[in-house]
Amino acid sequence: MELLKLLCLILFLTLSYVAFAIIVPPLNFPKNIPTIPFYVVFLPVIFPIDQTELYDLYIRESMEKYGAVKFFFGSRWNILVSRSEYLAQIFKDEDTFAKSGNQKKIPYSALAAYTGDNVISAYGAVWRNYRNAVTNGLQHFDDAPIFKNAKILCTLIKNRLLEGQTSIPMGPLSQRMALDNISQVALGFDFGALTHEKNAFHEHLIRIKKQIFHPFFLTFPFLDVLPIPSRKKAFKDVVSFRELLVKRVQDELVNNYKFEQTTFAASDLIRAHNNEIIDYKQLTDNIVIILVAGHENPQLLFNSSLYLLAKYSNEWQEKLRKEVNGITDPKGLADLPLLNAFLFEVVRMYPPLSTIINRCTTKTCKLGAEIVIPKGVYVGYNNFGTSHDPKTWGTTADDFKPERWGSDIETIRKNWRMAKNRCAVTGFHGGRRACLGEKLALTEMRISLAEMLKQFRWSLDPEWEEKLTPAGPLCPLNLKLKFNENIME
């Protein structure tokens, strides 16, 4: 009996401690910034609320007043930042605010098993090895596959129109195009998502993403250590997908020695592995992250671009169509003022990853003049909040206004660079760790949108509920568009 009472007491104390750790931030967290209630992160799972609405209702006021808040996510309390000067400090002082990805933050999770240790999440000498291996392939690439895939996408849309399908869900199609783009441009093989309607590789990836990005397990990743059948299957599927992906790269680049004559990012990774700069797991991790990040962010941007062109079809869709008509060389698209101002505004309005928490303090430090952060605390940034901050963007911060970037291409480029340097736009992050794929992603957007504009007019499906994603990547939720073709003048 006494033993039973003792066990009950231990269980009660344990549960009380866990509840306290979830409800209340650690006592050594800064007291001079607000705490966002722990339950806020769960609201999109319970109610039909998207992440921009969540930000406006529960985070915006505190974030805009203080520039930083305490925020519960991923089984822990974090410091979440949006003020530009704080972000500039974080990006500049990487030795204090060190990159710390899922492989360190939640190494026991299915998500960490999926992406591993890679060029996005690594730190120090290891990161430099990764960066040296992949930079050339991501910065200097052949854009011909992107042009070809944009035409294939348009053909698929036309086929659906011929079948009488006037309202078309764009998420699956844009994902298929983005997968083929990154695989052909950076990995040296054709994923085949556009040309094969039932692509086993693609279906495997979709299944994994549903398992890994389940909102509940993202919020409580420690549950992945429990013998839950669905999580055990998630780990098994992750291992299988990684093996299939690397085998495909081996078949296309290694076994035939093609990597020796090519400059794909994957080719450079293989050379780094052969020269013993990186090991086999690091090779696999970086091939996986190139595919994952290299298709997700362009897919999200493309969907947001299509959405905004549909929403403002009478103005911006018509303006851009007139500008791109007659442009036959894809490289000329980079010099079009309206197209580029539009794209930069899309990135500002809807950064593909609205919230990123992947920095960890290596020592007790001060953020700004007054916010003292203990050692070992995860610090993240709310990209949506930064690019919608009225202190930076004025009273039109929430308005879609591509003209804010300028009227000529030189001014537009200058303002884009300045906004990134001032950390006013962090969709591609900043500092030394700025996204290596920015050039590739924007090239994909220019070519794909130009081809769409030449071949179609489109509008929002009246039956589609105008809503953004509830959590995670930011874009229109299950976007549906109505198309008409034969619009070239």
Swiss-Prot record:
One of its GO terms (biological process) is ascospore wall assembly. It is an enzyme of class 1 (oxidoreductase). Heme binds at C435. Keywords: Heme, Iron, Metal-binding, Monooxygenase, Oxidoreductase, Sporulation. The keyword Iron applies. Its EC number is 1.14.14.-. The keyword Cell division does not apply. One of its GO terms (cellular component) is endoplasmic reticulum. GO terms for molecular function: heme binding; iron ion binding; monooxygenase activity; NADPH dehydrogenase activity; oxidoreductase activity, acting on paired donors, with incorporation or reduction of molecular oxygen. Its cofactor is heme. It holds the Pfam family p450. It comes from the Eukaryota. PANTHER family: CYTOCHROME P450, CYTOCHROME P450-DIT2. Belongs to the cytochrome P450 family. Involved in spore wall maturation. Thought to catalyze the oxidation of tyrosine residues in the formation of LL-dityrosine a precursor of the spore wall. This is Cytochrome P450-DIT2. It comes from Saccharomyces cerevisiae (strain ATCC 204508 / S288c) (Baker's yeast). The lineage of its organism: Eukaryota, Fungi, Dikarya, Ascomycota, Saccharomycotina. The gene is DIT2.
